[in-house]
Amino acid sequence: MDKYFYNEASAQKLGWEPSWFGCSRFNDDLIEAIVEYQKSKGLTADGLCGPGTYRRIYTDRQETIHKFKPNTKNNTDSFIVYNSEYFDIDWPKVKLWFEGDGFKQRKGFKRVFEKREPNFFVCHWDVCLSSESCFNVLQNRGLSVHFLIDNDGTIYQTMDINDVAYHAGSRTWNNNSIGVEISNAYYPKHQGWYKRNVGEERPLITDAVVHGKRLKPFTGFY
């Protein structure tokens, strides 16, 4: 068997990189590194990163994902995580689930080992006062989203984008989407809370029409 070809095909299908094994190329060094990893986990040491080996190293990376966060000069760059890899994002306020003040999804989602390729976003209006409140509501209901956007614009990522969040009802929608909850309590009666806790009231939407029906005034976005 051509082990180079096998590992390249496996990486393309499953979504892993030689760097997961401490290597930079698909070569003999990678095969040897895979063998050593397999030995350490009690797996068949054949140097091939098949589904079994991939699941083990994927899980290991998920458990220690904080160790792989890229180093930056001023430590101000922001990242999101997809398939155990970091991607930079042009936004100053991003919190990942493993950081001290982040929100970690503990139930209500499905771990996916093969690389998932979501092709659309589902954005929800959470009808909660804050992302923390929304996260707690979702956890209590056994539901989840990948991202929450708070009142101050902070983006909270609660899980790897590659995992399936339970947020859109149908399995078809969930399997192919990224779920986002945008903080907004909706009802004008909460304006006092925003004034006290955020510093200003939200704008009011007073002329919205949906399916030919005029809606009562509701809070918009900052």
Enumerate the language-model features and the residues they cover.
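Active-site-adjacent loop/helix surface patches within enzyme catalytic domains
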Residues: 88-222
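Cell-envelope/ECM-targeting effectors and their regulatory/trafficking segments
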Residues: 1-100
